[in-house]
């Protein structure tokens, strides 16, 4: 991360989360309980910041054991750490030891609710509000129906009713695109602009448009974003 910061003039953000797959932790020789993964995330953030500050660090616990480690080169500036996740627990962790919160696929109503909770958590920690991001799936086309037909909309609706999403607003009742709007931004360019501005109105500072459902016409989506969506978002 420090080397990347040097190369790009400090324009780098570190994303942090608990991970998903147990076999990844097993391959690295780490325990994979939720408690252990939460501890590892917090400790990694703390150690990175100490090293980025130029400290020579000695550290030992059940996860790490090293002595007199220092970092060269130093980052251009202190690298912000954003916590990835869309649950109340992710908001608490972001407020405790991160500089921002970056949920992935999250419906608009749930985003609004979580941002309010996140703000409360930062206040409880006595810290200024962190940066708020989102990574919505995007599908842009000549009309909404065509845009929805190019992505697995039924699958996304089904995902919204999965028990793992029990903290989402209206969990278990998702039936239509409108129920998952925000998780998916679809329609004409002006529709995506409107939804982006709604995100911004409700506390969003940073957005990443996820085009991975439109690999077949990736460059068309890039053109829509670059020529129609982004100029309108910036001008609004």
Q: Which residues are covered by each model-predicted region?
A:
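Active-site-adjacent structural elements that line small-molecule/cofactor binding pockets in enzymes
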Residues: 1-236
